[in-house]
Amino acid sequence: MEYRLFGQVTRALMDASQAPADDIATRIDALDWNRKVWSALATDCALPENQLPMELRASIISLSLWVGRHSSAVMRKEEDFEPLIEINRMIMQGLAGRADAA
């Protein structure tokens, strides 16, 4: 389920990165969706009942904060989409590895 969600939001980021510069709605929608996904992950990692190792939880929360900052910079056209896409791809690889190990 998480893998599919990351695949969908990453595809939206890729599409937004190729959209015309004046297509602000596509950019905003993709960045906002990605930010919401990461925010939900961070919120879940902050819960005491979360079963992930503390170090991994802290890393996910840290990445979520970075995603928020970088997304704002992308909207200001100070940064590009590629780092957001790459991080999501790395998460997808980790999720695929977890599914293979199960």
From Swiss-Prot:
Gene Ontology BP term (one):
bacterial-type flagellum organization
InterPro entries hit by this protein: FlaF (IPR010845)
Question: Is Ubl conjugation a UniProt keyword of this protein?
Answer: no
Keyword list, A-Z: Bacterial flagellum biogenesis
Q: What does this protein do?
A: Required for synthesis of the 25 kDa and 27 kDa flagellins and appears to be important for flagellin assembly.
NCBIfam families the record matches: PRK12794.1
What protein name applies here?
Protein FlaF
Species this chain originates from: Caulobacter vibrioides (strain ATCC 19089 / CIP 103742 / CB 15) (Caulobacter crescentus)
